Amino acid sequence: MRIVSLCPSNTELLAYLGRLDDVVAVDDSSDWPPEVKRLPKVGPDLRIDMDQVEALKPDLVVASLSVPGMERNVEELKRRGLPHLVLAPHSLDDIANDLLQLGEALGETKKAAELVRRYHDVLDWHRERAASAEPARLYWEWWPRPIFTPGGANWLSELSELAGGRNIFSDVPQASVQTEWDDVLARNPSHILLVWVGVQTKKMSPKAVTARPHAQQAEAVRTGNIHILEESLYCRPSPRLLVGLKKLAPLLHPALFPPADDSDPLLCG
């Protein structure tokens, strides 16, 4: 089978299902597992080279609608008559359903079901632990200028709760929210989590926040709780969010959650 993946989260789903050997090309940003870096690239996820995709004669193109603008890819796949599957995850349950849907399409239903069972076990364990925590007020920053942050309709609001926190923009019923720094200050986060999409952690600094007007009004700034996180563990709707959750929870509540490590709970044991 010849598979093309058009975004990083889809590539990661294929890896969990053990089908990377069938992948003949990926988008430019797919970088996990590391072996996908050797695969041919078909362009950025919002500007896929469909001529190249078609030339690869795929048996299945795994597309997504997780980011605005991706619908152009889907329309072009339909126009060219290329066999495709479209995933549109916005919640943690959506991600589990995507695993099942992709597993069915690939004849991997048993493996997908086992992955989903373990996935829900991890979520349930964190949910039980987090229930006794005083929720930390979390401000997630996807992009600094203009400011974009996840709203209540995004998986990071759910992930926040499972780590013993609360997304301060969870009251906004959108997946992505454009806002102003003054609004962030008014909500007074106790932790600021920088996950700038597509930006490496080594290129980021807390100074990007502390230099902003009236930054000291935020509890997170006064207490030094500005955290630079790996965006690939938080901004992609794949089971790798569980690795991000394992890192975030002890950061917020070290007495409740075990120290973080890099192990993936779906790939252990």
Predicted regions span which residues?
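N-terminal ligand-binding lobe of clamshell/alpha-beta domains
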Residues: 1-269
